[in-house]
Every structure is written in structure tokens, then in C-alpha cells.
């Protein structure tokens, strides 16, 4: 995420007001989706600082920290720009990693396909081998092997069609591509 909130207290807002943009925290990631607002303090920021804003486009948000006792290390949520059409820009708190299309915008299918990968048992276990800590770093996320884009998009189509975003269903979908 781009925003270290405790270093930018003067721009934080609790309520939606003129000129604010949403500030997403890891608490907004719930059961594979990004929910906003959740009546948390400091859910908005007022800023023109480019380094604190990002385009409102499709992302996969991944929690940066997880508790040791949590069953999964990779905990992610699908962020779709179309759910927040009133904003051109958003901000993410630094305890969120975000996956985006650097060269092109990610389609809804692609974001959901990435969700299938990151929400699967295989990827969670692989990540634990790469990194034994409870911290999820972008370096390791970027180092993880992924299928080609067409396969990822097809996985996204399948999970959307099924409307079942569970780990078990993600595992079933992924098995169809990895054996």
C-alpha cells in the first residue's frame, strides 16, 4: 500500500466529504471481497500528493500481515473499480499489497483468476515454503510462478460462473490446470 496512515494524520478523515478519496485497510478485505465503507475510523483521505494516490482500477488486494494462528497466510480480496465509480483515485494503507496490471488494466476475469490462484491451498502452502514469516511481501508475491494469462482469465470465468469463492472451489478450478 501507498499510505502510512500514522505519518499522514493531517489528511485522514472519518467521513465522506467533498474532495476525499477512500483509504483501504486490510480490514476491508472480507471473505474474498473488498467491502467499503465499514464504519472504521480514517477511511478517507484528502490529498493531492501523487505518491499517496493510485488509479481506481481493478486490483487484487493481499493482506501484508496475518496472525500466526490464522490458517492461511495468503488472504486476498477482489477490488473492482466499477463498484466505486464515484472515485477516480483511491489510496491503500501500507498493510495491503496490491496486484495490478502494470502495462494494461486487468479485466474482471483476470482479477478473479488471480484470486483463484492466491486463494488456493497450493499457493498458500507454496508461499509458506518461500517465506516462513507471517508477513506477506510483494517480492515473494512477484516471484511466485503463475499460469499464462489466458488460463488465469479462464479460471476467473469459472469462479465467477460458479459464484463459489471458497478455498475448496478455488482448489478444484486450479486442479483443472495443474493436474
Regions found by a protein language model. Give the residues of each.
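Polybasic, glycine- and aromatic-enriched phosphate-binding surface used to engage nucleic acids
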Residues: 1-164, 168-174, 178
Amino acid at each position: 500500500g501507498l499510505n502510512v496512515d500514522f505519518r499522514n494524520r493531517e489528511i485522514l478523515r472519518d467521513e465522506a466529504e467533498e474532495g476525499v478519496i477512500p483509504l483501504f485497510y486490510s480490514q476491508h478485505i472480507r471473505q474474498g471481497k473488498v467491502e467499503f465503507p465499514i464504519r472504521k475510523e480514517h477511511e478517507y483521505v484528502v490529498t493531492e500528493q501523487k505518491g499517496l494516490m493510485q488509479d481506481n482500477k481493478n486490483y487484487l488486494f493481499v493482506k501484508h500481515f496475518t496472525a500466526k494462528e490464522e490458517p492461511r497466510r495468503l488472504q486476498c480480496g477482489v477490488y473492482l473499480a466499477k463498484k466505486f465509480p464515484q472515485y477516480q483515485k483511491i489510496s491503500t494503507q501500507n498493510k495491503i499489497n496490491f496486484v495490478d496490471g502494470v502495462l494494461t488494466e486487468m479485466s474482471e476475469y483476470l482479477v478473479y483468476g488471480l484470486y483463484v490462484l492466491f486463494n488456493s491451498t497450493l499457493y498458500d502452502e507454496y508461499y509458506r515454503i518461500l517465506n516462513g514469516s507471517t508477513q506477506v511481501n510483494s517480492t515473494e508475491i512477484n516471484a511466485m510462478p503463475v499460469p499464462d494469462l489466458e488460463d488465469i482469465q479462464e479460471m476467473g470465468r469459472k469462479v465467477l460462473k460458479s459464484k463459489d469463492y471458497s478455498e475448496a472451489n478455488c482448489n478444484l478450478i486450479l486442479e483443472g490446470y495443474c493436474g
